[in-house]
Amino acid sequence: HYDAVFSFNYSAAVSTNCNRHNIPYISWIYDSPLLTLYSYTITNPCNYIFLFDSEQYLQLKNGGINTVYYMPLAVNTARLDRMPMNTMVHQVFDSDVSFVGSMYNEKGNFYERLENISPYVKGYLDAVINAQQHIYGANFLEDVLSPDIIKAIQEITPYTPNKDGIETPSYVYANYFLARKVTQNERFEILKAVSDHFTTKLYTHNPTPELPDVINKGPIDFYDNM
């Protein structure tokens, strides 16, 4: 008999089986957005779902989901304290500015899949993305996707909700297509501006020729180097 089952991020299949056998299921979420959280299985009483995204936590909690809890992401300080800090480490990693993360510029990313959409809809989506980049503290991407716009996107890149899911196409398109494009634009613009004045190192998977003054170091090992 197991005392509990633990996973990083949430699995509907694990929750279903834990619920069947009355075993507590603890899931620690580190991705946002995470589509599996819109499975109806998150209401299973066996669940203890810990989210670091306070906005998503409140959205679910205020929606009557009582199996979610807010918890900031943790760090193993003991492991970090054991990492050596010598001259070689400083030579490799020191920089005025460093950024670790995806630039969302992988070939065939979600927004690129809309390249064959009508000029009107493409112009509308580009304008929405541009507007969102200039407004902080409010995310309106999902609100401005009208049924006609959703229909046009569906014709190019259809989306069918999971059988156990309650997510809407507007949620998926707003958060996985448009929001990622907003993030991509912002990261390129910020790194371009910063690298004009400071030594800037970028740790990411893909080349960034659009940022000639940024030192792209490729991916970094999260365990050995961070």
Regions found by a protein language model. Name each.
Residues H1-N62, R79-M85, N216-M226:
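Extended catalytic core of nucleotide-activated donor transferases of GT-like folds
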Residues N66-T67, P72-M226:
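Nucleotide-sugar donor-binding catalytic core of glycosyltransferases
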